[in-house]
């Protein structure tokens, strides 16, 4: 029993510690890449080439005074960022980094991840409501509407992938892409899924809940110190999670780019990391290149474009698989 508990704790720490380090350096990478795209230098003072900037930012947030609004519901106000960050961590339980390298290899891994991601809206909307601020509440309402709208499309797009793979288990979905990655036969599904992931994680050009010009900072406007830091960590952890999800569903997870001996020597976890880093770069590139959508444009895209198209793709994929007897 003791050995089992030690192994369990080691597995949990093996996910949490690299994830927190990844989030810290993702923030630095984002600032560096955006600075390069905008012909600036970016952080370059703290440490060599600014590599210690995440540590300095973390220490700054830790030693700041947590300010609690006098009219806020204190308990819910404090629990909302904890809920957001906890859900962001729980989702990683079913993500395989290599064959067999997964915390819990569930047969319903896709459904588990979809359920956890849909719960993330509660942390945001309770934060906006408990703050008792009109800016925070409007930001939370926008975020809730945005996340719920695009979750419907994400769910239907996931069905197309599940039909092709014949399983809800992430490891089996990756192994189903041994001959060809799903990004090629399902390219429109991949595009819609990635754009929906941008909206689901409240990233540019869909970062309407945090629209600085009109809502100051959105749902976390009243947060400071570690409350703000937990929301920040949760957002970037979800970015890495969605990049991992795109990698598993469409780019073959840990499978090498080409099935040749020299590529098979490289560990699968390295291939997985390279693909995730590619998607993270695209996240940053989109933020630097595209302007923010209006709220009505965002809702129209979700309900009038992506929802009918994703439903049509489910019908089309089902028809093709049945007609050619390709059902797994």
Curated annotation (Swiss-Prot):
InterPro entries linked to this entry = NADH_UbQ_OxRdtase_su1/FPO (IPR001694), NADH_UbQ_OxRdtase_su1_CS (IPR018086)
How would you describe this protein's topology in the membrane?
A: Multi-pass membrane protein
Pfam (any one): NADHdh
Where does it reside?
Answer: Mitochondrion inner membrane
- Catalytic activity annotation: a ubiquinone + NADH + 5 H(+)(in) = a ubiquinol + NAD(+) + 4 H(+)(out)
Any one of the GO CC terms: mitochondrial inner membrane
Q: What is its EC number?
A: 7.1.1.2
Going by the UniProt record, its keywords in alphabetical order are: Electron transport, Membrane, Mitochondrion, Mitochondrion inner membrane, NAD, Respiratory chain, Translocase, Transmembrane, Transmembrane helix, Transport, Ubiquinone
Q: Name one GO molecular function term.
A: NADH dehydrogenase (ubiquinone) activity
Highest rank taxon of the organism: Eukaryota
Translocase among the record's keywords? yes
Similarity remark: Belongs to the complex I subunit 1 family.
Protein name listed in UniProt: NADH-ubiquinone oxidoreductase chain 1
């Amino acid at each position: 029993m003791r050995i089992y508990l030690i192994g369990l704790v080691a597995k949990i720490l093996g996910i949490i510690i690299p994830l927190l380090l990844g989030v810290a350096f993702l923030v630095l990478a984002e600032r560096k890449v955006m600075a390069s795209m905008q012909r600036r230098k970016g952080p370059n003072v703290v440490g060599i080439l600014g590599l210690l900037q995440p540590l300095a930012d973390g220490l700054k947030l830790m030693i700041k005074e947590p300010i609690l609004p006098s009219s806020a519901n204190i308990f819910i106000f404090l629990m909302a960022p904890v809920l957001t960050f906890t859900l962001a961590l729980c989702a990683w339980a079913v993500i395989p980094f290599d064959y067999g390298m997964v915390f819990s290899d569930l047969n319903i891994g896709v459904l588990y991840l979809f359920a956890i991601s849909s719960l993330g809206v509660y942390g945001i909307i309770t934060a906006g409501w408990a703050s008792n601020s009109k800016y925070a509440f409007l930001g939370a309402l926008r975020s809730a509407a945005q996340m719920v709208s695009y979750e419907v499309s994400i769910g239907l797009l996931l069905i197309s992938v599940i039909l092709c793979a014949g399983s809800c288990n992430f490891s089996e979905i990756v192994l189903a892409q041994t001959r060809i990655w799903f990004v090629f036969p399902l390219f429109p599904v991949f595009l819609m899924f990635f754009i929906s992931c941008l909206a689901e994680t409240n990233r540019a050009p869909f970062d309407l809940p945090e629209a600085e010009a009109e809502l100051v900072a959105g749902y976390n406007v009243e947060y400071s110190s570690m409350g703000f830091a937990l929301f920040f960590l949760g957002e970037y952890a979800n970015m890495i999670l969605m990049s991992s999800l795109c990698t598993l569903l469409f780019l073959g997870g840990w499978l090498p780019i080409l099935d040749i001996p020299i590529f098979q020597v490289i560990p699968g976890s390295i291939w997985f990391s390279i693909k995730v880093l590619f998607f993270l770069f695209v996240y940053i590139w989109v933020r630097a290149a595209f302007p923010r959508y209006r709220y009505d444009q965002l809702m129209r895209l979700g309900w009038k474009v992506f929802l009918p198209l994703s439903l049509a793709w489910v019908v089309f994929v089902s028809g093709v698989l049945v007609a050619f007897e390709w059902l797994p």
